[in-house]
Structures are given as structure tokens and as C-alpha cells.
Amino acid sequence: MQLNSTEISELIKQRIAQFNVVSEAHNEGTIVSVSDGIIRVHGLADVMQGEMIALPGNRYAIALNLERDSVGAVVMGPYADLAEGMKVKCTGRILEVPVGRGLLGRVVNTLGEPIDGKGSIENDGFSAVEAIAPGVIERQSVDEPVQTGYKSVDAMIPIGRGQRELIIGDRQTGKTALAIDAIINQRDSGIKCVYVAIGQKASTVANVVRKLEEHDALANTIVVVATASESAALQYLAPYSGCAMGEYFRDRGEDALIIYDDLSKQAVAYRQISLLLRRPPGREAYPGDVFYLHSRLLERAARVNAEYVEAFTKGEVKGKTGSLTALPIIETQAGDVSAFVPTNVISITDGQIFLESSLFNAGIRPAVNPGISVSRVGGAAQTKIMKKLSGGIRTALAQYRELAAFSQFASDLDDATRKQLSHGQKVTELLKQKQYAPMSVAQQSLVLFAAERGYLGDVELAKVGSFEAALLAFADREHAELLQQINQTGAYNDEIEAKLKGILDTFKATQSW
């Protein structure tokens, strides 16, 4: 078969017409130095602050320092095989993570990739890790409670939906335990939870996940993990990733709870990055913007109004407010709350729960110090019954602490003082609670009612715990309907007061403990 010249030229023209060229313009640069997870890149003229830079091997770095003749970027992941002279490209994208309901019940890394071996995740889209917090007009005041299930917290330091409540204390004082119990208590409340583990041992995180699974709480929880073995960049970014996942629910008119465990380790990771980028160090060698590091994160936890939710969902969700409640954790050194990072976070948050090692070692657990623990906005969110019954508890404890210090020096005390001391000791004993045993509002109310109305007067100190257990078992057995009513309404009136009094009178007359 022979082709003549016209056929050949026609064939060539046809092929040229069909040839599809897609031109891609990439701003390309060259790595000029690699050290400790930081790369310096020359030639990226148009790069943005916080932009993802594509590296060889399907990895990314984030541009943090934009200098005159080079860009300082932090590598997300392994960097040992990166070398001078390698080509890198701008992506034009800010770091985004997958968000959506598909993440519930899963364990993911900072980038939202599954690390639990349960297969891929079906997400509802992507969200930028850095987002601007809702404005003043878009917010609504906090007036609904988040029940932690702890008597001492829900009575004296109540937390509301959309609040930021700091959990602060030395190592091994029960900070994580309190946060995990708060997640377990949300099983049936409809609040979605996000647990962000920053710089922790992988074995510790595995234990937390196992406990959540045992108590059926993992199904409505997202666990975001940046372990101690991961790069400083991933530890620094983990809280922002978790926050973006929590905001998905907030912006759609739902309630979410996020725990940052802990922000001290995030600040240390950020300090490491900043020093390697040669930013000037400030107090305790932290960079100057370490306050902004935490404030821009914690301001994203808020209660947003129905108009904001309606506008965000383009009218799909109407008449619903959304909230993201944050429980950041800070570890102190030898109880020093006046150090740089603790004071920063105390000033950003709406209150703090201070856990003390001396109380913990004395067997008072949760080791909450009611003297310097405070909730600045949670009082408005407390249920009526808890508000009414918890008033005397804080006063009783404050008087007890004052008298206990005084009684060490006084040999003979009058009867009134002895009575107050005894009552304070019993209330302290009553507020003790085992881990993984959160209590409902009705159970807490019944116990607080007993303390408030003097039913502990003739109970021996050593038997307060067994008195409480027997009382709750009796109420569950004989008065389940009343407990259910209190849990549903949270109301307190003369009728409920009379019924609670009746339960306690009957219990003390007929039961033993």
C-alpha cells in the first residue's frame, strides 16, 4: 500500500488538529539547604505564607518564612532523602484536611489519613486547617450545658456549649482521664467529639482509643494523632486539623466537643520550628507569636447563631445554632501556673479546672482544686436543678479549707466548728469519683441534695462512699421514672424537692450501707 504526498499531509494535519496540549504553569524552585526538617528554597517568587510546596516523592512542605532571597519551609513527614539541588513546585493551595461524618469512629493523622487499618475514609469534602474564627455578630451567648459526668466539675465549674475551659495541672494528675470521661459521657447527648493527641506516646494513644471503644464512645469520636515520634511540623499542625474537623459539625447546626491533649507540647513543637527557622526567641525561648498560636486556635471554639448556620448551609439548616466546645489541656511544671504558656492560655480561655498533685496523691480524685478553678460563662448554662443544689457545695468546701488550716493550730474547737469541719470532710469524700464512671444529672442531683440538706450528718466519714453507692442503687431501683424526668428536663420545683426528700427519708429509714 502506497500513500501519496497529499494523503500524508492530510494525515499530519488531522493528527495536529487532534493533538491536545495542556500547559501547566508551575512556579519552580530549588532546595538550597536541608536540616532538621527545615528546607530553604530559592526561586519561589510567588509563594504564599502557609502554602503547600510539592516535594519529590509525593510529600509536601509548608512555607512559613518568606525572606528576600529564599523561602523557609517545614517538611511534613520524612526528610532524610531530600538533598540540595532538588526541584520543588508551588501548589497554590493552603493545607486542607478531609472533613465529614465518615471520620467519626476513626483514628487519623494530622493530614486526615487513616492510621487505624480500617480502610479508606469517605469524606464530605475538604476544609482549610487555618480558618478565621466567627465574628462577634455571628456568635450567640452560651446557655446550654456540656455535662462531663463529674460531680465536682458539673456542680462547681460548669461547662457550656461553645465555651473554652482549660484543664491545667502537673503530669500524672488526671487531666487526660477527665477529658476522656467527658467524651464517654457524650455517648447519648448527640455531641460529636474530637480528641487531638499531640506529642504523646503511641502506646498511650492506643490505650485511650481502646477505652473509648470499650465504653461505646468511639463511634461518635474522631481521634487525631501526632505522636512524639512524628515531626514537629505535624505536632504543631495537629490541633488546627482537629479543629477544622470539629468546625464541620459546628457550621451545620450541631454541637461538637474538642480536646487538645496537650497544648504545651504543641508550643514546644512550634518553638522548635521557630528556632530552626532562625526567628528571634523571646521569653523561655518561645517565639514572639506563641500567644497568637493558641488564641487563633481557641477563638474558633464558639457558639454560632442560627443566621450563621443558615447562611453557611445555604438555607438547608434553619433555626439551629451550632457550637464547638474546647477543652485544651496544659501541663505545668511543679504547679507553676504563672509560667509563660499557662498564663497565655488562662487569659485566652473562659475558665480553668486546676488539678493538684497533692490532692491526687491524697486520694481525692478528680483532684480539682475548687479554690482557683473557675468557669467564667458556664454558670449561665447550668441546669436549674444543678444550679440550685450546687450553691452550698463550694461554700462548704471554702469554709472547710479555711477551718482545716486554722484547726491545725487550735487544740480545742467549739461544736459549731467541729460540725463544719466534719461536713466539709464528708462533702470532699462525696465528690470523689472513679474513672470511667460518669454520672447523670439526676444521680448528681440526688447526691448533692443529700449533702445540701444534712443527710450526711450521722454517716461516718469512712462510709460516705458506700452510702452514695447504696443511695444511687436504691433510687435506680425504686424511682427510675423521677430520675428520667430530671435527666430530660433538668427542672427544679417544690414537687421535685419533695420527691427527692421522700427518696432520702425512705432510704435512711429502710436501707443499710
UniProtKB/Swiss-Prot annotation:
Chain residues that bind ATP: G169, D170, R171, Q172, T173, G174, K175, T176
Membrane topology summary: Peripheral membrane protein
Pfam families referenced in this protein's UniProt entry, alphabetically: ATP-synt_ab, ATP-synt_ab_C, ATP-synt_ab_N
UniProt-recorded Gene Ontology molecular function terms: ADP binding; ATP binding; proton-transporting ATP synthase activity, rotational mechanism
Organism superkingdom: Bacteria
Keywords: ATP synthesis, ATP-binding, Cell inner membrane, Cell membrane, CF(1), Hydrogen ion transport, Ion transport, Membrane, Nucleotide-binding, Translocase, Transport
Main subcellular location: membrane
Places the protein is found: Cell inner membrane
Name under which the protein is recorded: ATP synthase subunit alpha
Organism the protein comes from: Yersinia pestis
